[in-house]
Amino acid sequence: MEEEEEIMQKRDFLKASALAAGGVLAAPAIHAQQPVRWRFQTYAGAALGEHVTKPIIDSINRAADGALRIELYYADQLVPTGELFRALQTGTIDAVHSDDDSMASPAEVRMFGGYFPMATRHALDVPVLFRQYGLADIWKTAYEKVGGVTWLSASGQDPCNFNTKKEITSLDDLDGLRLYTFPTAGRFLSRFGVVPVSIPYEDVEVAVQTGELDGMAWSGITEDYTVGWADVTGYFLTNNISGAWIGSFFVNEKRWADLPEHLKAVVLACIESGHFYRNQWYWGGEAKLRAEGTKLKLRSIPAGEWRQVEDAADEFWQEVSETGETANRIVSIFRQYRDVINAAGVPYSFV
């Protein structure tokens, strides 16, 4: 009898031990954290977004290993591009890739995002201006003042050329053209008779076909071919009003604050890697498509005549610099940098 009782006690002990062990093994599954989920919208349509935004999002999702999962939306899919800032600030979306101008940012730096006339000549000017000349600190501070949105990083992309249905060979040819363009760029181009038009990104190609638009002053030739605009316009003007688009990555302030430090590092590293990808994609694309592209005929306005646009940009800079302390500071940096690259000569400047 005593022997049977001892056997029963051993069985009970083993059973209890097994249950306890199972509980320990199951504990991580019970207490595992749910992945952080973000909804991210880019300024770019699907065809362009495949190159300018999606590689970064894919890299973040892989590197985060399930701890952060970002769902990417393209231009106007969740909210119109002009409402991106407010949607981000209120938490309707969690992160954004856009220029300050297009998303109607209330920050003091708004008009300098996108294409500020004649501020840059090459894509690499943008990281130099932000990292070596102080623009990063200005942008960061500007969004801290507004609140609700954290600025993460900026980069350069393609120049702002013209692709149109009719050829442009003089400034007079710009008069009356209805062009899809950025707010500040449109404000500047209106000095030459351009009628700036703002419509949803994905509607632009059809608007050219129906005659609502005469073309675009929105991008370089790489984007024209990538998104289909080269199929509906016949000419590409090699003169540009800016050498590189200034675009940034933004995140809702609270969502960023709540993100663990190691995931913040993942996000920032993947964004920086994406900057490199876009630099080579655009730089190579602009050259190859100008040299070998068959859809758009290249045209140019003579340098002497184009000088009028450069002079008008100087006047525009002065007007903008008088609008506030931050604007004056940024314009001063642009002037300082222009003096440096002009003195350096080719390939930094064109003279």
Where are these regions (language model features)?
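N-terminal secretory/targeting leader peptides
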Residues: E4, Q9-V126, L135-D137, T141-V351
